[in-house]
Amino acid sequence: MNDDSNSCCMYVSAEKANPLTLFLFTQACTNFLVTKGASVDGSNFITYAADSHIRYGELYFTPAADWTPGSMRTIYDRGTNAVRGYVPQPAHTYQVVGYINENQVALGETTFGGRTELIDPKGLIDYGSLMFMALERSSSAREAIKIMADLVEEYGYGSDGETFSISDANEVWYMEIIGKGYTPKYDKKLNDTINADKGAVWVAIRIPDGYISGHANAARITTFHLRDGMKSITDKDWKKLYNENVEIIYKHDIIDFARRKGYFNGKDADFDFSAAFAPVDFSAARICDLRV
């Protein structure tokens, strides 16, 4: 969750408290991901706590709807509620209550921030809109991943780095995403300046059944199995999205982009998402990870 300080969490020592007493400000987020093989009742579930007494005291209800061609959806900034822009509606959207839809697709998030130069100030889609549109449009966790990837590719991603928890009745996925910054380029056809790096880089990993996971405002994906067309695929392989053996999905140019930006210069097999895009600092290592 984004807070106004852009910090996942903070600590201070209190003058009148006992020595070494720490107080943790609770403007932060924590998610836990539990697969059906690890739960008592055999169900998948995720938790999404904003760790704050002033946020998310209500649930929003969006009814299912059919849309005529040309219908547009307003994109509101999650932090300010300002209108960011508009995108076309699909033919049908699903009912959503809070962060779960009628198909039992559920989402949660925590903000890890990452390299600030990778925020696209002109990116239309912020992290909140990305979550709600994924819920409105998806019938499974895997479909939600594709929808999120397609939306930021087409319209740009305008938020900090995020970790998403994505679940349905059968699977639980863990996804990390960060923008590609803003590189202005003049487009002759449009007669306008565009972002040559519009979009985002991301990795999604399925949590094995019988396991649990968690995240709390720190990027946790390091190295991962690279594309083999079976266990691991990229966005160039969407036709294989629903193959049961697929456990990893990632943006096809993620390593090339990191090299171009100077974030990584090793062998492909050694590529580390967190080290490249959100290097661990004190807060992430000692305070954010402490919560999970």
Residue ranges and their predicted role:
Residues 2-3, 11:
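Acidic/polar hotspots within intrinsically disordered regions
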Residues 8-10, 289:
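Secreted/luminal cysteine- and crosslink-motif detector
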Residues 25-127, 147-292:
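A contiguous strand-loop segment
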Residues 119-120, 129-138:
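Second-shell loop/turn segments in exported
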Residues 4-6, 18:
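Intrinsic-disorder-associated, low-complexity terminal segments enriched in Asp/Asn/His/Tyr and depleted
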Residues 11, 23-25:
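Aromatic (phenylalanine/tyrosine) cluster motif
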